[in-house]
A protein has these predicted regions:
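Bilobed "Venus flytrap"/periplasmic-binding protein-like clamshell domains
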Residues: 48-54, 63-78, 112, 131-186, ...
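Short helix-initiation/N-cap motifs at beta->coil->alpha
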Residues: 85-97, 142, 177-187, 191, ...
Length: 288
């Protein structure tokens, strides 16, 4: 009877998934799933970064990082097995449009809550709070030791990362060079087109670790504060609440801390634990 009961629940779950595809709401779910045949069942598409070591990184055909761990936990809590999770690379410039056109069901990509306009997407979380940091070539670490040394220099930022205006406020006569991705900023830094990269400290640590050889170094005191959220399509407030509940469970059962420890082992980064884990507030705030 136990096996039959479990089978019945699984069949019911597939019916719910199918009803979602057909646009019905009998199962009271907000998530959009696609069916790739009965063998695989419903899948969930999650937009992630592929170029942020320690957070979202694609290497050898496998995704890894803290954001990936968070995405997997949330998807599992929503009822999706590992084989039903499909990761798709998104860029800051495509995150919102990928949600709007249904390419992905959610985005877990170092997505700061202040990166979007009101009503553009639904947000859940936050799940991590970070500071900003400066990343320089090691041979410049003696002359660029912090934000006070940025005057007259060129600082690279990636779209969707540290806002350009906040970098301009750090020092007089600083030139901000905005690139599409962090690897582009890293290349600019290595060939001398930029003197520093301004990025979230988690991202800066990942870039330095991945480059290896001591070529890059995080310098100075961290500054500013940003909180990472999970984004879903505008209007999916029920799904945002479900994700909030999953994130809270991750923090409560120790899985969040395990993911943090794994990130430390990978890139040597530990977030400011006076700010983490952050309070889950975003889906509730969107109702106000």
């Amino acid at each position: 009877m136990l096996r039959l009961s479990r089978l019945s629940r699984n069949i019911a779950a597939l019916v719910c998934a199918a009803s979602t595809v057909l646009g019905t709401s009998a199962c009271d779910t907000s998530i959009s799933v696609v069916t790739n045949g009965l063998a695989q069942g419903p899948t969930i598409a999650i937009g992630v970064a592929a170029d942020q070591p320690g957070l979202g990184f694609l290497h050898g055909g496998e995704y890894s990082g803290f954001d990936i761990s968070v995405a997997q936990y949330v998807a599992n809590t929503l009822g999706f097995a590992k084989k039903q999770i499909v990761f798709k690379q998104v860029l800051p410039s495509t995150r919102v449009s990928s949600l709007e056109d249904g390419t992905v069901d959610m985005v877990v990509d170092a997505f700061a809550a202040d990166d979007v306009q009101d009503g553009e997407v639904e947000l859940a979380g936050p799940y991590l709070t970070v500071h900003a940091a400066l990343l320089v070539r090691s041979d410049s670490a003696g002359t660029i030791t912090g934000t006070d040394d940025l005057a007259g220099r060129t600082v690279c930022v990636a779209k969707g990362g540290i806002p350009s205006y906040s970098v301009r406020n750090l020092a007089e006569d600083v030139t901000v060079s905005e690139r599409d991705t962090y690897p582009q900023c890293e290349t600019a830094l290595m060939i001398g087109q930029a003197d520093a990269i301004a990025a979230d400290d988690a991202i800066a640590a990942g870039l330095a670790s991945n480059r290896g050889g001591g070529y890059l170094k995080v310098v100075g005191e961290t500054f500013g504060e940003r909180s990472y959220a999970i984004a879903v399509k505008s209007g999916q407030s029920t799904l945002a609440k479900q994700i909030d509940a999953a994130l809270q469970s991750m923090m409560d059962d120790g899985s969040w801390k395990q993911a943090i420890d794994k990130m430390k082992q990978s890139i040597g980064y530990v977030p400011d634990m006076s700010l983490n884990p952050p309070a889950i507030t975003l889906s509730a705030a969107s109702e106000g």
